[in-house]
């Protein structure tokens, strides 16, 4: 079984949007052991959509067409697929009534926007795929030796339709005889190449497929097994994960979807009944925003400080003027004074500070990417850590500083 993903949209061709749909769908297919070696991008022109379908038909059995199902003039995908396959479009009357009800609930008259009826059409002979978060129907159609799947383009509609409406069909038709098991692992603070070299040296079972994905704030590693009995697969995966976690103890932060350095730090603070605060200079509040993106962060975080200027560090945190004058703001001494200052001012257990040079220019003779982290934990000596992140963008330096700061606190507390 081989699949092809055709993504429709002039915005994709022009580079105006990132095609996250194809990536998500390819990952779902991989978990079903469905190979998808081809991905095609095409604009909204019906002739080119049909040409892409003809090419896909020659090399794939399962063909996905994503995007172009809306109510506007350039949403032509369903009609183009129907024309190519010689299938008429049929109106799902019940679904059209649902669309009208939703439009009226938004104070939009269906008579004012009659083009919305396009979203209730599907291919004759196919199975409509409901849209849990939008209006346009998808379709699942078997046509001889080929299966065609038409899906919406907006990611907030695409993913729920794949998860709730499409996957049951794929599992029923193509999942038989295939068993795929995998685990998603998360790492912070380790370069991808070095991490993968170390994992390769662990002597893991040769049936395990280990792949890595670089994200802005972490490295994700997926460990996968194909066509193995469930009990054996579970045992092999757990053994491998335990070995990896021991090897990379300082950098491994957890497994599964939704895991992040921030979520793990919040969970650890909750477990220990501790509260944290922050004092940020170059990161400008990014640490506190990242922490507060985790549900339940209010249990471990009351507030903090953004002290960009030296005067703010002195006035709000109590950093001695002499410390700044003698050592500068980009220094071990200032980072430690900021950490202890915020921890004491807020009366909490942990204070984490960030001071440094985001770039692009040098500061106080320090090159861009020089960052000091300070960590003050009640009852312990204040500590600090130097980061060197040369040749990176301002945003990368800020993001990486936050991740490394959270990792510093996490490892110190666990």
Curated annotation (Swiss-Prot):
InterPro entries: CinA, CinA-like_C, CinA_C, CinA_KH, Competence-induced_CinA, MoaB/Mog-like_dom_sf, MoaB/Mog_dom. It comes from the Bacteria. SUPFAM superfamilies: CinA-like (SSF142433), Molybdenum cofactor biosynthesis proteins (SSF53218). Transmembrane segments: none annotated. Gene3D superfamilies: CinA-like, MoaB/Mog-like domain. It holds the Pfam family MoCF_biosynth. Belongs to the CinA family. This is Putative competence-damage inducible protein. It comes from Limosilactobacillus fermentum (strain NBRC 3956 / LMG 18251). The gene is cinA.
